[in-house]
Amino acid sequence: MVTPVRIAPTAAARARSLLRAVQYSHGPACPCHSSPSHHHQHVGSAINHAKRSLATPVDSFRQKEYAFEMAASSVRFGPGCTKEVGMDMKNLGAKKVIVVTDPNVVKLDAMKQVVEGLSKEGVEFVVFDKTRVEPKDYSIKEAIDFARPQNADAFLAVGGGSVIDTAKLMNLYTSFPDADFLDFVNAPLGRGLPITKPLKPLVAVPTTAGTGSETTGTAIFDLVSKKAKTGIAHRALKPTLGICDPINTRTMPSAVHASSGLDVLCHALESWTAIPYYERIPRPSNPIQRPAYQGANPISDIFSLQALRSTVQYLPRAVRDPDDFEAQSQMLLAATLAGVGFGNAGVHLCHGMSYPISSQNPGYHHHGYAVGGTPIIPHGVSVAVSAPSVFRFTGASNPERHLAAAEIFGVDVSRVKKSAAGEVLGEALAKFLVGLGDQPRGLKALGFGKEHVDELVEGTIPQARVLMLAPSLSAEVSEEREQLRGLFRDALEY
C-alpha cells in the first residue's frame, strides 16, 4: 500500500475541531477528531506524532489520541456449530436463558437446533419472538418489559442484526433496572452515559450475513419521536460469543442476501477510509473512556480490507444463486470480519446519512421484505444508496486508500490520477450496485426528492458518533450542513 502524506492542520482547522467537539460532545462514548483533511500515515509516523504530543504541554482536551484498542466478541465459525449452544450456556453457568428471536426465525432450523441444544443440557429457557425488523424504540421497550420479570442470567439471540441488537438492549436495561431509556442512548439524542458494570452473558447466533452485530458493542434502533435512527455504543454490549454457522444463512431470501451484503460492503469501506485513530480528539483521561469507534488503525485495516475483497467476490454470487453455499458461507465470514473492523475503527457518512433515510421513509417498501405491508427501507439499502456520492466526496482525503478500494472492484488504477480517486471509486460502486439488480438507483427511487433534502440533513447532523470519523467533512456546523446538502442532492440518483 502506498504511504499517504500527512497534511498538518492549520490553526483554523484546530479551532474548528475544538468547536465541533464542544458542540457534539457526548461523554466517553463519543469519538471525535481534529482536521478532517488529514491523511492516513504509517505507524512510524504515528509514533513520532505521539512523542511530539507527549513532549509538548497542551490543553488535555485538545490532545490527540496516541493509542488504539481492539475489542471483539469471541467467534466460533463452522457449519453445524449451532448445536453446541446448549453446552455453551451450561459452561457459562446459565440457569435461565431468554432466547430472543423474531416471528420468521422462530420457525427455522436455527431455532430448532437452539431449543434442542438447551433442552438436552437441561438449561431452562423462555422465548421472546416478537422482535421487530429495523427496531423502533417502542419495540425495544416491549422487549425490555418482557425480560425484566424473567430474572434470567443469560441471553441468547437467534436472528439478524435487529434481533441481536434487541437482545443487547434487553441485557443492558435489565442490568440497570432503574435507568431511564435515554440514559445510555448516544448524545445528543440521548444522555450518552457510560455503562459502569459488566452485563450478563449474551450469545449471538446470526442468521443473516450483514450487520456483524455478533462481534460489536453497538445496538441501533429508530427513535420515533425524533424521526431519527440512533443507538447505544459501548464495549459492554458486545456478545460473549458469536456462533457463526453458515447453515443458518441458507434460508435468507435473495433480497435479504443483497441488503445484508451491502451493509458489509459499507462497513468495510467506511472503516477503511475513516480518519486515522491518532487524529481523534480528545485523548481519554482514563483508558476506560476510550470509545468503541476510534478511527482506522493497522489492525482494523486488515479485517476491513479482507471483508471488502470477499464481499466484492462473493455477494453477487450469493444474490444470484440460492444454492451457492460457498458464497453464502464466505459472506457470513465477511460480515464477521467487517464487524471486527468497523466495530473498532467505526463507520462514517454512509451510515450517518442512512439513519434519516430509513427513519424518514416516504412510503417505500423494498421488494422481498415481508413485514406485513409496512413501508421499509432495509438498513443495507439505506446505507448503500448514498455510497457513490459519499466516496466521490471523501476521495480527496486519502486518494491512496480510495484507489486501493477501487482496485478491489476490478478497476485498473495504474494510470488514474490521485485527484480522480473519489470519482473512480464512486463509479465502481455504482456499477457494482447496478450489477446486483433490484437496487434503488438513488434516493429518488425511494421516493425522496429535492424537497426532502433539508430534513434529511437535519436528521444527519445529530449523528456525531459517526460523523466525527468522516474524512473531508467540515468541523464547522454551517459548512457541514452545506456539504451534507450537496451529498444528499448528489445521491438523488446515480
Predicted regions and their residues:
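C-terminal charged capping/lid subdomain of soluble metabolic enzymes
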Residues: 3-8, 13-53, 405-494
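Generic secondary-structure signature for well-ordered alpha-helical cores
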Residues: 90, 119-123, 133, 148-149, ...
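ATP/NTP phosphate-donor binding region
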Residues: 31-154, 443
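A glycine/threonine-rich phosphate-anchoring loop and its flanking beta-alpha core
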Residues: 176-292, 397, 404
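Glycine/serine-rich anion-binding loops at beta->alpha junctions
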Residues: 151-170, 207-214
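Short Gly/Thr/Asp-enriched flexible loops that form oxyanion-binding sites at enzyme active sites
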Residues: 113-114, 141-144, 163-177, 215-216, ...
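Active-site segments that bind and position negatively charged phosphate/pyrophosphate groups
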Residues: 277-428
